[in-house]
């Protein structure tokens, strides 16, 4: 009986093996365009016959298809012969965000950042702050952040549904980078969150109010990171990777901020009407950002602007019962005719406890001192300890 044919790679001489490798490589190179994605660590491909076709990752199904197509061309090979080339350093590598920024057309000189910001709000501080935030986002995509991470997150707020907040956040991403947008960040693992900072371009903290207060220190720490020490999935070794992702957020609640000193990491803006998310000219918007970064425009917030943002966030603070009792009994500003009382935290605590003991449940004088500091009550240090300047109502 006839002996069944076997692939050429089975039990062959070194010369035949080299010949097969050459035939397989030539077939792949003449039919497909390949590239290695440094972010996802995947090889991507598209047919050479249609360069407009988008690249897509090679999985097991695609690998088997390539092997079958080689068989149809008379090349008797195994899938390992195909994968040997596909997963080799002969495939050129690229970084999706660097490539996007490198291939942008020249900026035409028309400011598109201001109209884009005004789609959300015409508040001057917002227009200015959104522009700086977008510069920070673009700087991280270009890998130019240095010591300045994009450590602020705009939070789009509206009590009513249907204002297109989440849609606007997603529409900031160019189409070719949409896969690097996410809106379901889980703050359960710091290592996992750090890995996402090195792989995503924009992370939407959608429904920002769902994140527990206990998670805020972790989130703020992530937002300040400019470089990352990451161990990727299925790997044992940690690597230092640049941060790519910036943060943005949405909420239907206005009582979001609980810590005025930490609120400089967020920029709350009220969305008063549905946001127009159509016709965003991504190429020219990012070309403008690229040109401004090249001209040395600052992509971080200075102390003065951070202070303005904290003042802007004041209406979005969430007050605890202890703060409410304090404000019902004392003021922190005095008129010309009035004099400040100089009271210790213990003195104020005792007086408030007489007024409303339930509101101070769980507090002691030391804990209450932290509340006064958080509220920004002016403090003076004396030889007898700290006193707070207040006016009794």
Annotate each PLM feature:
Residues 278-313:
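Long, low-complexity, charged/polar intrinsically disordered regions in eukaryotic proteins
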Residues 216-239:
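Conserved catalytic/switch belt of AAA+ P-loop NTPases
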Residues 300-393:
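DNA transaction DNA-binding modules
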Residues 193-198, 232-250:
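AAA+/SF3 P-loop NTPase mechanochemical coupling elements
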Residues 200-223, 257-262:
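Conserved AAA+/SF3 P-loop NTPase catalytic/coupling segment centered on the Walker-B
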